[in-house]
Design a protein with these regions (language model features):
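Long, acidic (Asp/Glu-rich), low-complexity accessory segments flanking structured domains
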Residues: 22, 28, 70, 168-180
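Active-site-proximal helices and loops of the catalytic beta/alpha 8
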Residues: 11-14, 18-29, 44-50, 54, ...
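Alpha-helical scaffold elements lining the catalytic groove of polysaccharide deacetylases
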Residues: 187-199
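Short glycine/proline-rich turn/loop motifs
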Residues: 171-188, 206-207, 321-324
């Protein structure tokens, strides 16, 4: 039997294992702590993420990057590597290592945002204007710290006049030309593959659980396969022997382009951008969309196969108009809708879920475009990123939004753990924007996104008893701080949700039972 399983695993190939996030203690959801300092992430793992049941953290790129002063220290400078030294606005290598160990020690996995398609922009100049002082020349395409020289870039392969990607309808230029002017690495070269693999392996050996691989649409699947094939197994201090790194690849596929997500399925998971774009449209009730249409949410909506998907309501790009998704994306700027959309995602079984944790910036729209979409994290005048202070009510200060700490979202991360592995069940809808569904007999959630009250008795599939709603409050000792839901011996319960409630949804689960 054992041999059979081993043989089957070998047949599936190593890559099948790169779809597994290796989460621990029955935890399921990850959170993107966008632009957080390593020291703050370490503290957050210990004081909040582990006790709240979060499975992992996506961290901002840890490599050294170009310093951009105009605009002043934009968040996106971190997507322009100048060396693979582990030194950034989030902290140095020592702080990174300390964070990875401390998070692992409390069972929270670290997933690294790996920017390996390119180095800095072609107009990045020459000098030591890297966050930790490494010298480089964008003009001569030299990055001696790695080292990469002009031989390691793709320009000879690119056939557009500008050297940039001009037409997403041409797969060759999407892979071989410069993405918004960023110096494009020649990943077909064994030398480049080796340097990228060394970078990833250093992080794997330090204890990370995997990677969000940036800009995969712009890399050939065959090149990625070669690089992934060189990755070490995860560090056995924290993971079982033979564990492959979890890989989730950023490919924006909303349809209509020659490059599809499908080309990357065998290599790892892929970001499902249709998910947040559609969910936003539904909760905003645009284009005639209704929540009741989500009965077949998931593959039934034309999303990728469930085992391939990494899902999210918003990400660091589309919450500020970068990348794809457009105006429908719901972010913390629309808190009521955002909480509902995130709760829907966390209640639903489709995909590996990622929660966004943002910083605030001064939004300033001119003709529909945010002039300040570049603004970096809360920082001191000298560009140093500010720590994340925790207020007495458990929210964050100094411009850090901390959506993952909002009671409704945190409690739904717990809900997802409690119902893990249970089937989508007991669907109900009013043919409009009131819907309900359960997860086996372990959890049940009811949404009212109509402009009128919800007042209905539903089959929850749950054992009879008194349950605390984990949205308006939660279980606290022998009582509930919010609504109490009484489930009868027949599994039926009465729900009442005013459209004017602060939150127009209710959720109960096995562990919120009194
Ligand atoms: C500018 C001009 C170019 C010109 C170039 C000359 O616009 O026409 O050729 O100068 O050097 C920044 C600037 C951009 C600038 C570029 C190079 O915004 O104007 O080009 O730097 O200096 C982030 C930001 C980008 C930013 C980039 C690098 O979103 O604005 O570019 O970091 O700092 C596609 C991709 C997808 C991508 C998405 C945004 O398929 O992969 O666009 N998403 C990922 C990340 C994203 C990141 C990158 C990829 C690049 O999630 O955050 O882009 O690593 O859909
Ligand atoms: Ca490329």
């Amino acid at each position: 039997m054992h041999l059979f399983i081993l043989a089957a695993a070998a047949l599936l190939g190593l890559s099948a294992a790169q779809h597994n996030p290796h989460t621990k203690h029955g935890r399921t959801a990850m959170v993107h702590l966008f632009e957080w300092r390593w020291a703050d992430i370490a503290a957050e793992c210990e004081r909040f993420l582990a006790p709240s049941g979060y499975a992992g953290v996506q961290i901002s790129p840890p490599h050294e990057n170009i310093v951009i002063n105009s605009p002043w220290r934009p968040w996106w400078e971190r997507y322009q590597p100048t060396s693979y030294n582990l030194c950034s606005r989030s902290g140095n290598e020592h702080e990174l290592r300390d964070m990875i160990s401390r998070c692992n020690n409390v069972g929270v996995n670290i997933y690294v945002d790996a920017v390996v398609n390119h180095m800095c922009g072609a107009s990045g100049g020459e000098g030591s204007h890297s966050v930790c002082g490494s010298w480089f020349s964008a003009n001569r395409k030299e990055f001696p710290t790695i080292p990469f020289t002009h031989w390691d870039f793709n320009d000879h392969k690119c056939r557009t006049g500008s050297g940039n990607i001009e037409n997403y309808g041409d797969a060759d230029q999407v892979r071989d030309c410069r993405l918004v002017g960023l110096l494009d690495l020649a990943m077909e070269k064994d030398y480049v593959r080796g340097k990228v693999a060394d970078y990833l392996n250093k992080l794997i050996d330090m204890g990370v659980a995997g990677f969000r691989v940036d800009a995969c649409k712009h890399m050939w699947p065959g090149d990625l396969s070669a690089v992934y094939g060189r990755m070490h197994n995860l560090n056995t201090t924290w993971f079982s022997g033979g564990s492959r790194p979890f890989v989730f690849q950023e490919v924006i596929d909303l349809g209509g382009e020659p490059i599809t997500s499908r080309e990357y399925f065998h290599l790892g998971r892929v970001t499902e951008f249709k998910y947040g774009a559609k969910l936003g449209t539904i909760f905003r009730k645009w284009n005639g969309e209704k929540l009741s249409y989500t009965k077949s949410w998931g593959e039934g909506w034309g999303f990728m196969p469930e085992g391939n998907a990494l899902v999210f309501v918003d990400n660091h790009d589309n919450q500020r108009g970068h990348g794809a998704g457009g105006a429908s994306i719901v972010t913390f700027w629309d808190p009521k809708l955002h909480k509902m959309a995130v709760a829907y995602m966390l209640a639903h079984p489709y995909g590996v879920a990622r929660v966004m944790s943002s910083f605030r910036w001064d939004r300033h729209f001119v003709n529909g475009k945010d002039q300040n979409d570049w603004m970096g994290p809360p920082s001191h005048g000298n560009g140093v990123t500010k720590p994340v202070p925790i207020n007495s009510d458990q929210t964050c200060g100094d411009g850090w939004v901390c959506e993952h700490r909002w009671r409704q979202i945190k409690n739904m991360a717990v809900f997802r753990n409690v119902v893990n592995g249970q089937p989508h069940a007991n669907w109900w809808d009013n043919q409009s924007n009131q819907v309900a569904f359960g997860r086996g007999n372990r959890g049940f959630i009811v949404f009212n996104n109509d402009d009128w009250n919800l007042d209905v008795t539903l089959n929850t599939g749950m054992p009879g008893g008194a349950y605390c709603d984990v949205i308006s409050g939660q279980k606290d000792g022998g009582g509930c701080t919010g609504k109490l839901i009484q489930v009868g011996g027949d599994g039926r319960a009465h729900f009442k949700i005013s459209n004017r409630d602060e939150d127009t949804f209710v959720a109960i689960h096995a562990e919120s039972k009194l």
